[in-house]
Amino acid sequence: MLSALLVMAAIAVVLGAALGFAAIRFRVEGDPLVDKIDAILPQTQCGQCGYPGCKPYAQAIAQGEADINQCPPGGEEGVRKLADLLGREFKPLSAEHGEEKPKAVAYIDENVCIGCTLCLQACPVDAIVGAAKQMHTVVDPLCTGCELCVAPCPVDCIYMEPVRETVQTWRWKYPVVEIRKAA
């Protein structure tokens, strides 16, 4: 019994070391510009920009295939930060991709929900929990407010509630000029 346990532990150590070596040896380097652009985007994964998520949109911006003003959840502040990062001229938010709205979170009226799971399938960040023919609910901290769960609901039990500003959620609304150290 003890020898079998030692053999299993040795196998686990060898496989762990092999995986660690492979992760270092075969690392795929990403484009640092794409990572910087992606860090500025709001990570709502809403698709309002015409791309399936924030990372593909960041790649398109870096490759020059998309404009910097297509992200309504990022708002004017996001466009300003992207313009500063890329050295481009600021453009107002594109109206064809939507308008900037205050941050909102989805809520499900649990008395009306029929448990069809359509909202579960539509949520890009898995912020909705529930099972078939069971009540569903939204995990507030995970919800990005993308509104993709609202349209598929057959009984209209999902509504968007604006997030009230608290000490934890308040953000400075005005452009911030970064002060750089003199060389």
From Swiss-Prot:
[4Fe-4S] cluster 1 binds at C46, C49, C54, C71. [4Fe-4S] cluster 2 binds at C113, C116, C119, C153. GO terms for biological process: electron transport chain. Keywords: 4Fe-4S, Cell inner membrane, Cell membrane, Electron transport, Iron, Iron-sulfur, Membrane, Metal-binding, Repeat, Translocase, Transport. It is an enzyme of class 7 (translocase). The keyword Cell inner membrane applies. One of its GO terms (cellular component) is plasma membrane. It holds the Pfam family FeS. It is found in: Cell inner membrane. Residues 1-23 are annotated as: Hydrophobic. It comes from the Bacteria. The complex is composed of six subunits: RnfA, RnfB, RnfC, RnfD, RnfE and RnfG. This is Ion-translocating oxidoreductase complex subunit B. It comes from Azoarcus sp. (strain BH72).
